Amino acid sequence: MMRPNRSFLGSTPRNISRHFPSLSTISRRQFTDAASHSSNKIQVYTSTSRDPFLNLSVEHHLLQKTPPESTVLFLYTNDPCIVFGRNQNPWMEVNLRRLAQFRNDPASVGWTGGPVQLVRRRSGGGAVFHDEGNVNFSVICPPAVFDRNKHAEMVARALSSLGRPNTRVNERHDIVIDIPDDPIGTYKISGSAYKLTRLRSLHHGTCLLRSPNLTNISGMLRSPAEPYIKTRGVDSVRSPVRNVGIENAAFEAAVVEQFASMYGNFDVREVISDKVLETDSISKGYEELQSRDWIYGQTPKFTFSTFPYEEDPRERPQLDFDTKLRFEARHGVVDKFTAEGPSSPASEDGLSALTSSSIYNVSSWGAQLSQAGMADGVAAKVGPWMDNILGVDFTKPQQ
């Protein structure tokens, strides 16, 4: 989501027609028993955790363990993070250098939101930013009744009930808000992603409510490496975005209300916490999502080139060095690396030593290129540029 604008603020109705009692947090055992019990056809869960890796692991557990004929609603809010699609390229989709600045020197860029985590989800779709001003919703149901608009429209109705009548689902299955007399007119407030298995289907999305970081979203989701990368992965579709100006709790209650209107009484309505991490399947999923092999190593094949070539004839930005660089990578590992220039900066045999290097484990491209035989003066120019473009300060292993 890109190109943020000012928030749309307004009064929020305080009362919702159906009253749901206050809920206490259930234990790990209670959660796993309730989720998997065959009699629990309609289930609703809200997470108190802000850990994106945990919440996505809970979501995956619900997808795998809930009864095949059940319908499940899961609501959660994450700490600041960028969540990108199963088949996306983080070097293409994310300004990794900016994330390094947020983590290592936030004052230099005026950032006060804490570290922004990078998360690869298990479903498809594009890259999105989450923070405390977003609520995420997931609906899991039988594939036979899956519809890309059905539950997006449920969320749009919830927003309408809270005084946002100009919300609707567009042709891309996104939830948008129309603002009369605004020069842009229509803003995206919610994007969705999907995962279908033989027995279950998942539709999940996020809704921009009161994000304090709206003006930073564009800078995080626009990679400086984009002009140089051609990928087989999925590209994000950028849209103007804005807040809708609703409190998280009111939004959650309204979505639960609409879910109840669609499916009737709940068999389960519970709150979960970090305790569910003690569940074996959730713990294993949590470890996988946090692993560098998952975040970076699942990247589809791509080519990085500083110059146009037959398969990617785009013009490149002007550089302050004349060396032509190109490498191919599979699963984040260099498959072939070439460097050409007037000074013959490195031999083919030397550059072949870069093959099998994991891009995300490189701490200094200058050092790598020097070791491969590139002249020190050339490597001193090319290396820092590559470090910057590829976000080495963020991707390299932390000490």
Regions found by a protein language model. Give the residues of each.
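Long, positively charged amphipathic alpha-helical accessory segments at protein N-termini or as interdomain linkers
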Residues: 61, 153-167, 185-307, 340-399
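N-terminal lobe of the biotin/lipoate ligase/transferase fold
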Residues: 2-149, 377-385, 392-399
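Catalytic-core signal marking the mid-to-C-terminal active-site face
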Residues: 319-349
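Short loop segments at secondary-structure junctions
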Residues: 87-88, 141-144, 180-182, 211-214
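FAD-binding core of FAD-dependent oxidoreductases
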Residues: 121-136, 172-180, 188, 193-202, ...
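Contiguous, small/hydrophobic- and glycine-enriched helical/loop subdomains that border
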Residues: 132-179
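Detector for conserved single-position "signature" residues within domains
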Residues: 310, 315
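Short, glycine-/Ser/Thr-/acidic-enriched flexible segments
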Residues: 80, 89-90, 214, 334, ...
